């Protein structure tokens, strides 16, 4: 479907139009791609390192704890999908607003998407809190694993509140071209804060798998603070790509 769409003559990106008008890529466009994309590339690499370190520590807690942890990660991914969808909306609307020279409208779009995300987060918190046991019983019959999962869910309800909002704000910043800041913020939060807090609570303080999830919560709070502060400063609307 994606390939077919770019062969339509009336699309914004149209292969027939490009070929008929002999449009060729320029070196300046290539430099812009590198300028915007290099920070995102390193951000993703370093974030994956942070995720891997967290997974290693979770696996070290034992098979039962790891099983409960993995289900918790899948449940958290569900809430991420809501934030990711609103992030895509914010990126498109903010990009269009900034392109039209209307930074105030871009900020309003960001705030509106964040409010919608906060409402969804509150709804998910209720579902996760009251349905924690039921959700884990869909995966496990062993009550001791379900008990571990319920404890994890009690941390996830706090994670969700910060997660959805930070994903939206990070998307707003990326849509404006502030990719270097988001890369630095994500690297500090995921690779450093998540790893250190997980080790501190999971091993040093002896909370086990719940301590690993405290690291996940610390990561989300840090990213939320970084993204919110940057968004409210408003400097991102002045970035030229």
Predicted regions and their residues:
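Hydrophobic faces of transmembrane alpha-helices in multi-pass small-molecule transporters and flippases
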Residues: 1-4, 22-53, 78, 82, ...
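Membrane-helix interface segments
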Residues: 64-65, 179-180, 208-209
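Helix-terminus/linker motif at the lipid-water interface of multi-pass membrane proteins
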Residues: 45-72, 78, 96, 136-143, ...
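A periodicity- and composition-biased signal for non-globular, repetitive helical segments
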Residues: 54, 76, 102, 180, ...
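Transmembrane alpha-helix boundary and packing residues in multipass membrane permease domains
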Residues: 40, 44, 52, 56, ...
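Short alpha-helical transmembrane segments in multi-pass integral membrane proteins
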Residues: 1-38, 94-159, 202-241
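Short runs within selected transmembrane alpha-helices of multi-pass transporters and secretion channels
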Residues: 1-3, 84-87, 156-175, 181-193, ...
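Small-residue-rich hydrophobic transmembrane alpha-helices
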Residues: 68-132, 163-186
């Amino acid at each position: 479907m994606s390939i077919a769409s770019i062969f339509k003559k009336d699309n914004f990106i149209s292969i027939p139009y490009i070929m008929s008008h002999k449009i060729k890529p320029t070196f300046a466009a290539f430099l812009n791609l590198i300028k915007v994309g290099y920070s995102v590339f390193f951000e993703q690499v370093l974030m994956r390192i942070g995720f891997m370190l967290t997974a290693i520590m979770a696996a070290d807690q034992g098979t039962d704890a790891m099983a409960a942890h993995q289900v918790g990660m899948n449940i958290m991914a569900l809430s991420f999908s809501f934030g990711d969808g609103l992030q895509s909306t914010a990126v498109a609307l903010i990009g269009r607003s900034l392109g039209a020279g209307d930074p105030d409208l871009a900020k309003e779009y960001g705030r509106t998407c964040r409010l919608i995300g906060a409402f969804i987060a509150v709804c998910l918190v209720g579902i996760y809190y009251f349905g924690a046991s039921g959700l884990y019983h869909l995966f496990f019959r062993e009550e001791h694993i379900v008990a571990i999962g319920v404890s994890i869910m009690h941390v996830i309800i706090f994670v969700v509140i910060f997660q959805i909002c930070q994903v939206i704000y990070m998307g707003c910043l990326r849509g404006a071209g502030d990719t270097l800041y988001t890369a630095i913020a994500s690297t500090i939060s995921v690779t450093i804060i998540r790893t250190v807090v997980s080790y501190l609570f999971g091993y040093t303080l002896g909370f086990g798998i719940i301590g690993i999830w405290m690291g996940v919560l610390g990561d989300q709070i840090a990213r939320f603070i970084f993204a919110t502060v940057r968004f409210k400063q408003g400097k991102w609307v002045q970035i030229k790509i």
